Amino acid sequence: FQKTAQQYDLDWHFLAAIGYQESYLKPDSVSPTGVRGIMMLTNNTAKAMGVSNRTDPAQSIQGGAKYFDQMLSRYSHIRNPDRNWFALVAYNMGPGAVDGIQKRLRAQGKNPNDWMTMYNFLQHNQASNGRYKQAVQYVTRIRSYLEHIKTSPKLLEI
């Protein structure tokens, strides 16, 4: 994680937390939806990121880092730390879903680039869309893992 994070100028803790949330760091993980590997890449995302073997740990981490970096760039107009949370939702749901939610928020006269506004939308609409509930849990868990990773000296060798 550390080596790959350096290539993209990313915080390696984020990559490790994403990998843990996605697969518990198990390279052979496969979801019923077809995503696989440590970073649980879809086949299309893997191809777009240059990954030929999603269950190869190095390729999966490389592909996940590249994709997360693209999501961060996509939301570069949003200030940190909010940009991180938007990028995580996009990593989880896809950027098209985030764009659609932002469009709805804008139409409601709300700030579509504010994390709490996005979070509240996802939270209040999760009964109508299971992906919203999943996105809330995804970001919440990764934020928790980030704190744990940053405060656990034993994890510094990931």
List where the protein language model places each region.
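Catalytic glycan-binding domains that act on GlcNAc-containing polysaccharides
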Residues: F1-I158
